[in-house]
Amino acid sequence: MLNSRDQGNLHSGLCLWLCGFLALFKGSTGCESEEQLFHRLFAHYNRFIRPVENVSDPVTVHFELAITQLANVDEVNQIMETNLWLRHIWKDYRLRWDPTEYDGIETLRVPADNIWKPDIVLYNNAVGDFQVEGKTKALLKYDGVITWTPPAIFKSSCPMDITFFPFDHQNCSLKFGSWTYDKAEIDLLIIGSKVDMNDFWENSEWEIVDASGYKHDIKYNCCEEIYTDITYSFYIRRLPMFYTINLIIPCLFISFLTVLVFYLPSDCGEKVTLCISVLLSLTVFLLVITETIPSTSLVIPLVGEYLLFTMIFVTLSIVVTVFVLNIHYRTPATHTMPKWVKTIFLQAFPSILMMRKPLDKTKEAGGVKDPKSHTKRPAKVKFTHRGESKLLKECHHCQKSSDIAPGKRRSSQQPARWVAENSEHSSDVEDVIESVQFIAENMKSHNETNEVEDDWKYMAMVVDRVFLWVFIIVCVFGTVGLFLQPLLGNTGKS
């Protein structure tokens, strides 16, 4: 005999077993219902026939594009690679059923290869298959509405204009349409006016500014029929941060280093060395970034124009530096400074640039007279009898007025008397006088040579200062002008 506790446990176990059996029976019934429905729908189904009751009726296909990733933009080959979901919605009257007859089944997932599908292809495909593979399943509803959303990776052709690289915008389009059915057989309708970007992964180099879709009815030269297509235009903008940091800013620094060449004095001897160093650094930099710049012969990219501008800039600085050094080391023996050069470079430009000769500043600070007054041609000394007697009188006068002792005065009068008596016949005195005149002439010539050399050096300083400002202006305005082009170009397009 079972007690009441054992009877309760047995009753509970029987209930659980019965519930599990009923659930299993119901599940097997559901699977059987789905299998029966599948066999009933596709027993006599022909996937090659359009799903229309009347041959003259078109199949209305609703089409929508969803983008998940902008994988790559190849500027050289002009290809845009995208990861897309293509949503097709149409109605097939042959695939209807009553849910009440099949245990309430309202949806059925069927292989896409088992049903009729619109042959929607990408017209401007560049690489790979033009048509989407039918490996995914389609969602079939009891009223005959079919939703098929296959994923696809397309490499579409996209004519690109890289004139303003790396500040460029591109307009790439994806053109979808039926390849064999015309408008009378398939009518494409676009779902919404924008590309679905809810599941889009941001790209590190490109930003999608706008993605709009448009429907077109086109008559091609090959055929009499009108074909419908849906074209999505992707307006994308390049993110220039990478190129700005690694390309443009180093070029700017190199350009401004070139300007500093004209601030170096010519005497230091490092002007040409600095120019060559800057040119070599720019050349090495160009070799490094060659693979980064799009290689095309259709247009010159903006960054290519800037690199060319920088190269010309550095080359001109070397030419100007050589010219300045040539001026700096000129002498009266090799060159004569024309008057117009003196007027322009020694008077006009210094006043405009507020430059003054260092010698002039020294004279103002120390109150020194013009050195030219000290280098005037001395009067030729002529030792005539009249001059000699005058000189001797002055010497006797000095001797009389002095406080020298009489013994010493008597001894000092003897050389003077000897000079007076033997001046006419002394050849040594004449040699001394000629030597003094020779020294005076050499000093005068040396001073004049120094003045001319100082003028050439000062002219070199003026030319350096002129080109310093010229190169600063050209560098600033050239850089601003080049990089304002994308802004002005986009404003004009808008």
From Swiss-Prot:
Q: Where is the signal peptide?
A: 1-30
Region Disordered, residue ranges: 399-423
SUPFAM superfamilies the UniProt entry points to: Neurotransmitter-gated ion-channel transmembrane pore, Nicotinic receptor ligand binding domain-like
According to UniProt, the reaction catalysed is: K(+)(in) = K(+)(out); Na(+)(in) = Na(+)(out); Ca(2+)(in) = Ca(2+)(out)
* Record InterPro entries: Neur_chan_lig-bd, Neur_chan_lig-bd_sf, Neur_channel, Neuro-gated_channel_TM_sf, Neuro_actylchol_rec, Neurotrans-gated_channel_TM, Neurotransmitter_ion_chnl_CS, Nicotinic_acetylcholine_rcpt
Please report the name of this protein according to its UniProt entry. Answer: Neuronal acetylcholine receptor subunit alpha-6
Q: Which residues lie on this side of the membrane: Cytoplasmic?
A: 328-465
Pfam families linked: Neur_chan_LBD, Neur_chan_memb
Gene behind this protein: Chrna6
Q: Name one GO cellular component term.
A: neurotransmitter receptor complex
Q: How is its activity regulated?
A: Activated by a myriad of ligands such as acetylcholine, cytisine and nicotine. CHRNA6 nAChR activity is inhibited by the antagonists alpha-conotoxin MII and PIA, a small disulfide-constrained peptides from cone snails.
Q: Which family does it belong to?
A: Belongs to the ligand-gated ion channel (TC 1.A.9) family. Acetylcholine receptor (TC 1.A.9.1) subfamily. Alpha-6/CHRNA6 sub-subfamily.
Annotated source species: Mus musculus
